[in-house]
Amino acid sequence: YKHPYFDDFEQEIPIPESEKNAKEKGLNFIKLDGAVGIIGNGAGLVMSTLDVVAENGGKAANFLDIGGGAKAETVSSALEVLEADKNVKSVLINIFGGITRCDLVAEGIIEATKGKELVWPIIIRLDGTNSLEGLEILKANPNEKIFIEESMDSAAKLAVQKGL
């Protein structure tokens, strides 16, 4: 902080372990009390994803923004953060590629899930930069708990259904 006296404010507010863990990984994460884990790129997209989940009768378990230009490792780290939350029943990954390349997001999903028995279904919506390549990567690495949806609304509906 520019003003050192602000340091005391941070020390007074207890931060959940999951938020500390995410911060160490360079992720913007806030724990919420729902069952649908949310991963997106950009605060606006994540907030609108929370809204669409709510419109479809669900409650978000978190706000997790991987930011712009996220690499495969970032996505893998985001999924690791959600694995620690026992309230998560499904995960919705909603990416609109601009700076963030959807093929790298897909690689991160495969990296994080390969050889693992997933504890929850992952619903993925990719759009934008290299989205077709990203979808091909996901299709080339099928997993019975990974679902691809074309729209944010259909992805949110499925995430809510799978999270019940």
Question: How would you describe each model-predicted region?
Answer:
Residues 1-93, 105, 115, 127-129, ...:
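ATP-dependent carboxylate/acyl-activation modules
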Residues 96-100:
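Glycine-rich, proline-tolerant flexible connector loops at the mouths of alpha/beta enzymes
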Residues 101-112:
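Short Gly/Thr/Asp-enriched flexible loops that form oxyanion-binding sites at enzyme active sites
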